[in-house]
Amino acid sequence: MEQIWFKSYDASIKHEVDVDALGTIVDVFNQSAEKFADQPAYTSVKTTINYRQAKEYVDQFTSFLQNELHLKQGDRLAVMMANLLQYPVVVFGALQAGVIVVNTNPLYTSEEMK
């Protein structure tokens, strides 16, 4: 199959990604937080947080899940929220804790949530 999208790539962009070299998505987030600490990470409405702040919030949420809710690796966490600044904090915090994120639609009825 011809992969015609490669024609639009700059010559410096590789056509293949070594996903094993990247680690987990949490590893990528943590590396980005270290490398781009003072750069904007997320913006929602009129609020922007940088990678350093995002990492602090993620670590705090991870601690909350483990120490207050006593969630363990493999436990599931249903996440029902709109596209807010808190969403990436919750997702990365849960993943960092080894918790499985189960995204749910805020418009689901109680019957659909069963």
Can you say where each PLM-predicted feature lies in the sequence?
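Structured binding elements
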Residues: 98
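AMP-dependent adenylate-forming
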Residues: 3-5, 27-50
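Anion (oxyanion) recognition and catalysis
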Residues: 95
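Conserved AMP-binding/adenylate-forming core of the ANL superfamily
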Residues: 17, 21, 38-92, 109-114
